[in-house]
């Protein structure tokens, strides 16, 4: 009985000891896992943040434009592991570290083998390093040629394994491994040597990259355009080992017998330098200010632009040819931008004729330079006028000497054409009609319109006045491209996009669809310069406008064709003048050279441009642009916005009853047997003067001083042209007697005299077209009225202010 109790006690005691041991083991295991969890949860920087990264700038199709250097002058792209070729990842582990997924950061067998060969047998040094140890050596810049350095490398490898997962360590190694010269990382090497991202590598390329880090200096040598013998031999040995695991890949054996193209580092592309520079600057600014950039795992590696490399090369080629061909005319520099109006993506951008030419300041991005646009803003004056009911495309405007207060614009050719339709005035770039339209605008005027369109750094509206219409302000080429794209997009303004990941913002309506359509239709009627000499018109409609800045510093052409907007500039960045810098002569030929080249390379298709439903066609009298009366001999059609466009019955053609005996206008009552009726053109006095100066005969309506309103049926009232509406005239305090304000007005052909009144007080009489000068006695508000000798009148307010 006692023996049984003793045995039972021994059994219980033994079981207790085993239970205690198991508890200790479990506690130890839990402690280890707890320590591992604590290490993983302890804050530590991502491995990608240990070293700076490069940026691969690519076009919309993924073609490399530029690979930037990291801050430490290395080419180093960070590519996530899931964007690496699986064949490359497996080949690296097969070649470098087959036990990677199982060891704790170091491989005891590998270390022992390396020590035996290096120190005992005296062979070539072998470190026995794992991928983790190689990463540790690079991150901490360790000297591992000594036993102490090797021990520190092992410790650092264990540290990495404690704080990071295997996938994170593998990803970091692949992005940090040396690939010859200053190229680091498999993703970088893939882009540099094979011009492709690492997820698109072929098997021969993947195996070649896998063996380079073991001896990069010998396996990658500069100046070669294919892999050298040392690299090919190492790759093929790895391929033999690869086949033991993947016998199905034996079908690729012929590829391993062929030379493998390998781009030398010196041949890295440097395309679209101005556009890439702008995109990188915008990216850096965005990353500085945007919190979203911190969460963008691919932000440092790849910048996808909206550029099309083929279109970029075409634009660069055409500019280079044009500048070379026109060198004798003093043309040294040019710039251009091409924008797709459908998504506002910049497809090609050339900031200068030669980025590397210091003589022309070639590194300046001309598309961002603020310069006088000349007449390229005129289409928007007319479009605003359409929306505000000032005119329609066939409105007849006056191209005559006109003073708008102190501002008296002249035309580029120094001549005046008299009556001209709005369409012809725009396409022939007449200054006086454009300024008159601008003077009639209310809100928005051109200045407010440009502000709404995002044009920056404008001076005050008072600084420019009406001169803004003719290029008195400064805009950039990119501003112009966005404005012309707005016309193509039916009046909806959207900013340009250079990065593919920039969101396409909702359009902001600045013009009506009707006004935009009419303006485009006007520009479409502008013949290209070589059409006048018999050249064939473009295969697609081209909606274009030229511009020339003051003193011949800038020549511009901007326009729409197919889905694109193209703006070209010819000039000098140092603002030197050249009489050859005229828009139609210097910029338009380059513009159409580019249009023709693009159409030859890819057939351009005109997008649908349906007539807006609110836009109507109306019959007009061609001489006046108004609704035809019964005596109008030539009639046509014009676009018309019901309820907005100004329209009235024409009064240019009128019947006059002629006395058969005298040939003068007959006095009422008329004797039908002794009179007859003829149709005459009644032109205002200012236009009659232009006709006379141009030598264009105009049969004047006969007059008869013996009777009032002899034979005349109707007529237009006079129209005040000075003082200018909305202007304040300054009167100096100590020299009030020197202040004289010019009164002037145009009048109907039937008017012979004009009578001027200020606040209903008669101040003088003059002939139509002659100026009358009035001297105000005090500052204040006045009403100026003019009455012709038929009782027809016009009036407007006048403000006179004091000035020290």
Segments the model singles out, each with a brief description of its role:
Residues 2, 36, 58, 246, ...:
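Soluble, non-transmembrane domains of envelope/secretory-pathway proteins that act on or interact
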Residues 80-131, 184-194, 199-206:
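Flexible, acidic/glycine-enriched loop-and-adjacent beta/alpha segments
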Residues 123-313, 410, 448-461, 466-471, ...:
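Non-catalytic, structured segments within soluble enzyme domains
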Residues 41-87:
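Terminal hydrophobic membrane-targeting helix
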Residues 63-77, 188, 215, 221-224, ...:
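Short pre-catalytic segments that frame enzyme active sites
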Residues 305-328, 336-340, 349-352, 357-366, ...:
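A penicillin-recognizing enzyme superfamily signal
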Residues 2-60, 119:
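N-terminal type II signal-anchor transmembrane helix
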């Amino acid at each position: 009985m006692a023996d049984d109790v003793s045995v039972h006690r021994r059994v219980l005691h033994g079981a207790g000891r085993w239970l205690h041991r198991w508890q200790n083991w479990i506690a130890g295991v839990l402690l280890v896992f707890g320590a591992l969890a604590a290490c993983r949860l302890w804050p530590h920087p991502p491995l990608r943040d240990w070293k700076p990264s490069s940026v691969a700038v690519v076009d919309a199709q993924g073609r490399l434009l530029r690979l930037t250097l990291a801050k430490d002058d290395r080419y180093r792209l960070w590519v996530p592991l899931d964007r690496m070729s699986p064949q490359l990842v497996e080949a690296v582990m097969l070649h470098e570290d087959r036990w990677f997924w199982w060891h704790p950061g170091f491989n005891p067998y590998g270390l022992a083998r390396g020590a035996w060969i290096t120190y005992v047998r005296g062979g070539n040094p072998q470190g026995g390093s794992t991928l983790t140890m190689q990463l540790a050596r690079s991150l901490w810049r360790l000297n591992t040629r000594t036993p102490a350095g090797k021990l520190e490398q092992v410790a650092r490898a264990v540290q990495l394994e404690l704080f990071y997962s295997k996938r994170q360590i593998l990803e970091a190694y692949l992005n940090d491994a040396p690939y010859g010269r200053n190229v680091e990382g498999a993703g970088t090497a893939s882009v540099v040597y094979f011009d492709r991202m690492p997820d698109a590598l072929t098997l021969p390329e993947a195996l070649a990259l896998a063996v380079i880090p073991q001896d990069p200096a010998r396996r990658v040598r500069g100046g070669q355009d294919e892999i050298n013998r040392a690299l090919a031999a190492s790759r093929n040995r790895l391929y033999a080992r690869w086949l033991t695991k993947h016998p199905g890949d034996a079908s690729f054996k012929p590829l391993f017998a062929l030379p493998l193209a390998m781009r030398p580092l010196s041949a890295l592309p440097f395309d679209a330098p101005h556009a890439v520079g702008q995109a990188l600057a915008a990216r850096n600014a965005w990353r500085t200010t945007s919190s979203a950039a911190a969460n963008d795992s691919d932000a440092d590696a790849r910048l996808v632009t909206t550029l099309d490399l083929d279109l970029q090369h075409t634009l660069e080629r055409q500019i280079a040819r044009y500048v070379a061909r026109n060198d004798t005319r003093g043309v040294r520099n040019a710039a251009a931008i091409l924008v797709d109006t459908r998504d506002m993506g910049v497809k090609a951008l050339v900031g200068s004729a030669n980025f590397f030419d210091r003589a022309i300041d070639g590194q300046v991005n001309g598309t961002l330079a603020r310069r006088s646009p000349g007449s390229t803003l005129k289409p928007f004056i007319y479009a605003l006028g359409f929306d505000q009911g000032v005119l329609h495309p066939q409105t007849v405007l006056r191209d005559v000497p006109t003073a708008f207060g102190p501002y008296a614009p002249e035309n580029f050719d120094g001549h005046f054409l008299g009556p001209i339709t709005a369409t012809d005035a725009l396409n022939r770039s007449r200054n006086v009609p454009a300024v008159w339209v601008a003077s009639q605008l209310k809100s928005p005027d051109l200045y407010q319109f440009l502000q709404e369109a995002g044009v920056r750094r404008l001076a005050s509206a008072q600084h420019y006045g009406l001169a803004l219409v003719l290029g008195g302000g400064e805009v950039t080429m990119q501003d112009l491209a966005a404005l012309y794209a707005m016309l193509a997009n039916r009046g909806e303004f959207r900013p340009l996009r250079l990065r593919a990941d920039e969101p396409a913002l909702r359009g902001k309506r600045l013009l009506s669809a009707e006004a935009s359509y009419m303006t485009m239709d006007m520009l479409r009627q502008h013949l290209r310069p070589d059409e006048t000499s018999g050249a064939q018109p473009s295969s697609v409609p081209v909606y274009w406008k030229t511009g020339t800045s003051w003193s011949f510093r800038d020549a511009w052409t901007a326009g729409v064709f197919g889905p694109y907007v193209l703006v070209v500039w010819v000039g000098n960045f140092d603002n030197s003048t050249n009489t050859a810098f005229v828009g139609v002569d210097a910029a338009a030929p380059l513009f159409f050279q580019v249009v023709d080249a693009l159409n030859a390379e890819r057939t351009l298709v005109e997008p649908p441009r349906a007539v807006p439903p609110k836009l109507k066609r109306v019959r007009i009298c061609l001489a006046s642009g108004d609704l035809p009366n019964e005596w109008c001999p030539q009639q046509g059609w014009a676009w018309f916005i019901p309820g907005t466009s100004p329209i009235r019955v024409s009064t240019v053609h009128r019947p006059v009853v002629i006395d058969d005996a005298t040939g003068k206008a007959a006095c009422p009552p008329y004797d039908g047997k002794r009179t007859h009726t003829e149709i005459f053109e009644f032109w205002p006095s200012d236009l009659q003067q232009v006709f006379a100066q141009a030598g264009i005969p105009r049969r004047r309506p006969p007059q008869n001083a013996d009777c009032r309103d002899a034979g005349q049926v109707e007529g237009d009232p006079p129209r005040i042209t000075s003082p200018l509406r909305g202007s304040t005239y300054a009167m100096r305090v100590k020299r009030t007697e020197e202040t004289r304000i010019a009164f002037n007005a145009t009048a109907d052909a039937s008017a012979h005299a004009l009578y001027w009144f200020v606040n209903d007080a008669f101040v003088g009489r003059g002939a139509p077209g002659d100026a009358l000068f009035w001297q105000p006695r005090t500052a204040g508000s006045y009403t100026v009225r003019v009455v012709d000798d038929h009782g027809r009148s016009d009036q407007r307010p006048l403000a006179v202010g004091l000035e020290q």
